[in-house]
């Protein structure tokens, strides 16, 4: 039986491809020109799943991924993984630093290497491209003089490593997520993360506090919260949230129900195992057993048996 491919941000030689291979998903890769195209391939049935970047340790969230998941047709995150990000400066054989006037790379690459470029290539022009591998391909074709990409892309495109380890901060990592159409959730592991997008009814004083309170009173730690414009009109935003725990945890389920009451829309984006193995600290009074005991007590009250 033919297995559907897994989509990723291509072309060959991107960190997204490296993440796909590291995930060892056992499917053929489907290269896509943009993050949006990779997610569209899943929605349209051309791919079973997609592997896309969602957060950089240097630049924060990847807005193209957040906005597509929050506002496009429903998809859910089923897994995550982290990939070390190490850039190299690649060029055609014989290229030296003094020859470089135009450098191509993904927009996320520039901020991670800005200081190095200012110190070593202060007069160069930065050319933002759809991916670092696309920059390598354009360097091979002569459209740019050099590319910021993974060193592994050099062999793919017949380039040489002009400078390895191009970065401002060592040990940078990017978190990637595996995305699928809605399906039964992965079982909770005790070391889980839940992602969602919360849309306000309207912007008003205390709106963010209302959202945060639903988590705080249940002892749920947020690992990410990011406001993003909805695109509908100026001043209208949604909040992307990552929290510790699984929707099958009583405290997380209760928090989502609370958000449902105070928000215009809550888009559930998945509960899945954390790749770092971090476990949530369950505050006294917020365990599943304590929620169950409280619910049983309320049930007795309603039947006149306190």
Q: Predicted segments — roles?
A:
Residues 1-306:
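Domain-level signature for soluble enzymes in the chorismate/prephenate branch of the shikimate pathway
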């Amino acid at each position: 039986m033919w297995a559907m491919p897994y989509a990723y941000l291509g072309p060959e030689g991107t960190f997204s491809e490296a993440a796909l291979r590291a995930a060892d998903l056992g499917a053929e890769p489907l290269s896509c020109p943009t993050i949006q195209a990779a997610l569209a391939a899943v929605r349209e049935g051309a791919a079973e799943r997609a592997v896309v970047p969602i957060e950089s340790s240097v630049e924060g969230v990847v807005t193209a991924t957040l906005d597509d998941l929050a506002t496009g047709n429903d998809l859910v995150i089923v897994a995550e993984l982290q990939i070390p990000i190490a850039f190299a400066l690649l060029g055609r054989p014989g290229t030296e630093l003094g020859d470089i006037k135009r450098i191509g790379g993904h927009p996320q690459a520039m901020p991670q290497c800005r200081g190095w470029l200012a110190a070593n290539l202060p007069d160069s022009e930065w050319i933002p491209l759809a991916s670092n591998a696309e920059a390598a391909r354009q360097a091979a074709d002569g459209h740019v003089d050099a590319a910021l990409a993974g060193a592994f892309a050099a062999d793919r495109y017949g380039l040489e490593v002009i400078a390895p380890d191009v970065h401002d901060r060592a040990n940078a990592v990017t978190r990637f997520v595996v995305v699928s159409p809605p399906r039964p959730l992965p079982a909770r592991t005790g070391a889980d993360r839940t992602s969602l997008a919360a849309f306000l009814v309207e912007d008003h004083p205390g709106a963010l506090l209302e959202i945060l309170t639903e988590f705080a009173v249940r002892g749920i730690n947020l690992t990410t919260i990011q406001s993003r414009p909805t695109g509908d009109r100026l001043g209208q935003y949604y909040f992307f949230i990552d929290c510790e725990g699984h929707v099958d945890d009583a405290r997380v389920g209760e928090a989502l129900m609370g958000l449902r009451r105070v928000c215009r829309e809550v888009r559930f984006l998945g509960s899945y195992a954390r790749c770092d193995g971090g476990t949530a600290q369950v505050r006294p009074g917020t365990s599943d057993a304590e929620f169950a005991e409280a619910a049983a007590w309320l049930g007795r009250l309603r039947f006149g048996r306190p």
